[in-house]
Amino acid sequence: MKRKILSLLFTVLMLNVYSQTSLDYKVFEKINEYRVENGLNELIWCKKTFLSVEVHTKYMIVEGRLSHIENSTTPKFTDRLMVFVDNDYILGNENVSMVSINGIEDSIDDIAEKIVDSWKVSKGHNKAMLNKKSNVGAVNCGNSVFTKNNYDFKVVYSTFVLWLDS
């Protein structure tokens, strides 16, 4: 019952702010192109999944760090996803990234390519992108600034979740 109430509350709060950006779309498109190149099905965009990844991307931006885990009531991606999806069991994967966009901040295509490439070169993230059993997913990206040694870097945090919706 508590999960249903929380789910309803989150859904009502998030319905007004649902806004897939052109960068979200481009990253998702590039992931699907990569999956097809590897003989897999394209993923179907899932609005409810988007709501869960949007929450996590915003969390990473506020915290200023890359993480799969949140210090919240929904620490894992499956916990966040189950708030929005009426499903008791989630089988899937989550990819997160933070990439510097200095010099390419005006090119959505270049930024999307850099995000997807960062997952391709990571064995675990690449395996997740190529999960054969997943059929739905969503991506969210958010801009931030990362400061190191008195230098500011424009960065994009990204969260991608794919899972099997049976």
Q: Would you name each region that the model predicts?
A:
Residues 4-15:
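Sec-dependent N-terminal signal peptides
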Residues 16, 41, 104-107:
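Short amphipathic alpha-helical segments at helix-loop
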Residues 20-82, 132-138, 142:
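Short, well-ordered surface patches within globular domains
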Residues 76-165:
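A well-ordered secondary-structure block
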